Amino acid sequence: MAFSAAASASTNLVPAVASGRGGAAASASQHGETARLARFGVSSSACANALSLSSSRSCASMGEVLWANGGAVRLAARRTLRVRAAGAGTIVQPEGFQITSVPTTPIDGQKTGTSGLRKKVKEFQSPNYLANWIQALFDSLPAEDVKGSTLVLGGDGRYFNKEASQIIIKIAAGNGVGKILVGREGIASTPAVSAIIRARKANGGFVMSASHNPGGPKYDWGIKFNYSSGQPAPESITDKIYGNTLSIKEIKQADIPDVNLSELGVHKFGDFSVEVIDPVADYLNLLEEVFDFDLLKGLLTSKDFRFKFDAMHAVTGAYAKPIFVDRLGAPEDSIFNGVPLEDFGGGHPDPNLTYAEELVKIMYGTDAPDFGAASDGDGDRNMILGNHFFITPSDSVAMIAANADAIPYFKTGLKGLARSMPTSGALDRVAKELGLPFFETPTGWKFFGNLMDAGKCSVCGEESFGTGSDHVREKDGIWAVLAWISIVAYKNRDRKVGEKLVTVADIAKEHWAKYGRNFFSRYDYEECESAGANKMVEHLRDIIAKSKKGDKYGNYELELADDFAYTDPIDGSVATKQGIRFIFSDGSRIIFRLSGTGSAGATIRIYVEQYEQDTTKHDLDAQDALKPLIDIALSVSKLQEFTGRTKPTVIT
């Protein structure tokens, strides 16, 4: 038997519809319902009791359902039913429900990583695929995080999220969860899920997203679980999930109907409830605590400051207008691609210079705005642009940290800074200048989460357009945009109308003059054949095994070659094989990684970095400045020989 999201009640229950209205019409209706139920063997006294109960609840709409089961009648609801006696916005559903054990067998390929489980939609739609994983998750959690618990559910609005929401709700109820808080229409950005978990003191939450990967019937879907701190589940849990997927035998599901996710309110099913919530409210409340919204509003309503935000038809479309327009006063036409769509409008919701082409053309066009930004599928990534100026993600996190005094949340100072290993060393120099603890971690936000929970990190970032702070335990696209607007506003706080604006480019160049510039670029080769990509990595590992300090690579002298490993200073866990590094004596670096965030094939990422202190060279194009290192990287790796690729899919 395969689990079906459409199953709303056990098959041995017989439905019959009754009216909740009073008066003569109600009496006639009740007589008809009694006759109908009698045909199913329900006693007249049971009918009378049930219909009396229905009438006493002062139904505000039709649609109550009486389920006849072995001569007993109990209340359920096939359609949404509002009941005044239960309080405004409360939707009363069955007083109880049955839990069904659905037999199942293990399904291959459910290995769960840092970003959860990501596959093609069709795979998730296959019988029991998602249900197996959800049940395996519940079987992996401590009892106190399941029985009677409160969990958050949200996603980026991509195709299959609505169906998946119903599956998750029913299995949650079947496993004894007490309450699900779900964003309206099943929508909530990844950082908002983290914020809601923390604000509502939930035991955890589900994020339905494949992040920046394309959406639609032929494309990607994903799911992950975040813990009570709001951060992605640690490997101790994800490893258990995978282990349980290999031995699963049953799925526990509740016989409840699909929940209407379009309207705010509480749906009660006995001691289990589903509350449909505004996915923006808790998140916006948090942002108002972090930033000076009056300062931000002053800039965004200024006649000589123009702002553009590309929501890429992704989840931040649900947040952009309430935050930027309604709360901060930006013109409504500041937002474009602002309606979340299941297929992201046919686009690739990855905020970089390639996939956010529409924004890039605006920001590099004639009469360009002063500030442009974009966010990705689930709202955790960001891209920042000035007028004809691009801020690399590596520079972005460094510049935010260096200008933290523009953000009230940091008024007591920064606790520490952290970056992922492939991210440039720009943040390192800020940490040194400010005398702050600094951490270099593997790629994956969970490593930052451990540092944050231990009070050791305030600001962190990844070169993959992820920036954030300890206000939540996920990277946060809108937070990064507001951080940058805060910096621009703070730099212009004493500016009089008509005076020259301190621009994004001015802020970047001022930073480089003080700290030097880390030229940085990333080459992505997407959906390479895994066999060739793995052979390339083995080839590189053979090279580093034989390498020694002083080896020459063109004009560069090797300082260190290794496969990055990390021992977590908080929990002592060790992560190995996190990226192959060639570090040269002048601080330049070449790094190779295989990315695991796609749903098919392998993505090879090559990172190149060179530090430059000479201000006369800071305006060089990054590709020109880095060309010698890029040539070395391609030659040493033999990428074309192993993969057949002659050019990257994306250059950042």
Curated annotation (Swiss-Prot):
Location of the active site: S211
The keyword Ion transport appears for this protein: no
Residues that bind Mg(2+): S211, D376, D378, D380
Modification sites for Phosphoserine: S211
Transit peptide feature, positions: 1-84
TM spans (from-to): none
Enzyme Commission number: 5.4.2.2
Disruption phenotype: Suppressed starch accumulation observed in plants lacking also PRAF, but no complementation of the slow growth phenotype associated with low sucrose levels. The double mutant missing both PRAF and PPGM1 displays a disturbed photosynthetic electron transport.
Example of a GO biological process term: carbohydrate metabolic process
Binding site for alpha-D-glucose 1,6-bisphosphate: R118, S211, D380, R381, T443, E462, S464, K475
Keyword field: Carbohydrate metabolism, Chloroplast, Glucose metabolism, Isomerase, Magnesium, Metal-binding, Phosphoprotein, Plastid, Transit peptide
Activity regulation comment: Inhibited by the Calvin cycle intermediates fructose-1,6-bisphosphate and ribulose-1,5-bisphosphate.
Broadest EC class assigned to this enzyme: isomerase
A GO-annotated cellular component: stromule
A Pfam entry, by short name: PGM1_C_vert_fung
Keyword NAD: no
GO MF term list: magnesium ion binding; phosphoglucomutase activity
Catalysed reaction, written as an equation: alpha-D-glucose 1-phosphate = alpha-D-glucose 6-phosphate; O-phospho-L-seryl-[protein] + alpha-D-glucose 1-phosphate = alpha-D-glucose 1,6-bisphosphate + L-seryl-[protein]; alpha-D-glucose 1,6-bisphosphate + L-seryl-[protein] = O-phospho-L-seryl-[protein] + alpha-D-glucose 6-phosphate
Cofactor binding comment, as recorded: Binds 1 Mg(2+) ion per subunit.
Cofactor(s) listed: Mg(2+)
Subcellular location: Plastid, Chloroplast
Family the entry assigns: Belongs to the phosphohexose mutase family.
Biological role stated in the UniProt entry: Catalyzes the reversible isomerization of alpha-D-glucose 1-phosphate to alpha-D-glucose 6-phosphate. The mechanism proceeds via the intermediate compound alpha-D-glucose 1,6-bisphosphate. This enzyme participates in both the breakdown and synthesis of glucose. Required for sucrose production and accumulation necessary during plant development. Promotes gravitropic responses, negative in shoots but positive in roots, by facilitating starch granules (statoliths) formation.
Protein name from the UniProt record: Phosphoglucomutase 1, chloroplastic
Source organism (scientific name): Marchantia polymorpha (Common liverwort)
Record gene name: PGM1
